[in-house]
Amino acid sequence: DLVTAELKDSVHPRQRAAMAMAKSDDLINWKLLPATSQPDQGFAETEVFQYEVVDGVPILLFCTAGPNISDERQAEGELGGVYSLPVREDLEDINFEHATLFPRKNIYASRLIQDVDGGWNLIAFINYVDGKFVGELCDPIPVTADPILGLVPKA
């Protein structure tokens, strides 16, 4: 399983987020493995991880809220949401600096699902609309993966 981690040796306190893996043979006793990413990659927190191979591209999906992104990302207009990045299949050397924000910016806590025809769709909770919390699931969004951009809406 993929787990949220925080690395204390970060130069920037708001960029301590990391990802690690935990393994279990019995789902009762777990062994935490070393982090697969480094600190200082733009996020204070990353959560709701999912790894899938989407249309041949290994993708890591996660989300974070606006207060948990770096000043640099905030200066570029990012407010948090669903992020993705192409990764190695062994999930080693994750670099969150390459993460891109999914174009639909009002969703959070997403999951990739396949439809009956094998196409990929993103479902997520609708976060805020016009300043009001919604908290409902959005309709499935057809997606594909780009080896540079990560997860993108299907054209």
Task: Say what each PLM segment does.
Residues 1-155:
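Carbohydrate-active catalytic/glycan-binding domains of CAZyme proteins
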